[in-house]
Amino acid sequence: MLHNKKSFAKGVFLLITFTVILILIFMPLFTNDKGKKLNGLEFSDDLFNKLSKGSSYFIPTISKSVDKIKGKTFDVTVKLKNPDTAPDTAKVLAIAGINAEVKDTGLKISGDLSKMLALALAASDKLYSDDLVGATALFEGMDGLKGVKLLWTVQSAMIKELQKAKMIEEASVVKHVNEKGIEPAYNFYGIPAENIGHKIPLVAGLLAFYVLYTMWYGYAIFDIFDGVGLSMKKSKVKKEV
């Protein structure tokens, strides 16, 4: 027997409509810029990736930091996680005007630090604009994505070595080039950038829908439980005799 038919019917209705909308969410009802059909989750993921890329362009600011260390030379030996990449890494560094010698499982590198970072930022700028051809040209024919990844790897290995050499400022600049320059460009390559200012109504609508949809399910379960006589009530405080 139902404890409250009205609450139970309301809960079932909410749960059915919740399920119908869930099915619609997983249907390819949306289309992206390239004409590809997307379901609701893919559409929102695509949108927020574009917005993330649009808010991750820091290259002009980082370039100013690199300018401050122009002429600063370094001489370190780094170990690479994959020693097989050492020859190609040495080629990339040579393009930047850095001396690189393959040594055991790593590289002995020296030169003007700003030149290496300038190449990393120039290539990252090309990738951020989805210009793989331009990035590849900077690496003299080596795939632009590969070249940037090699720079990121060797620069990551350099940070601790620079810190050991008391080149704290330089190590900080290298870290920022990797995190704010290379990583966004590499990770968001192929994704168009969107300005959130142009998408405020859509973003607000998606967030409002998310909150409403979550509450929708919660109320459905609550009303169904209430309808069958299962509800949460505050227990009475027992009075001592």
What are these regions (language model features)?
Residues 1-40, 207:
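Hydrophobic secretory-pathway targeting helix
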Residues 2-11, 197-241:
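Juxtamembrane interface at the cytosolic side of transmembrane helices
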Residues 16-22, 76, 100, 109, ...:
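Generic structural hydrophobic/aromatic packing signal, biased to beta-strands
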Residues 28-57, 194-197:
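Alpha-helical transmembrane signal-anchor/signal-peptide segments
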Residues 55-65:
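A glycine-rich, hydrophobic loop/mini-helix early in the fold
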Residues 63-173:
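Long, solvent-exposed extracytoplasmic domains/loops
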Residues 174-209:
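Short, aromatic-rich amphipathic segments at membrane interfaces
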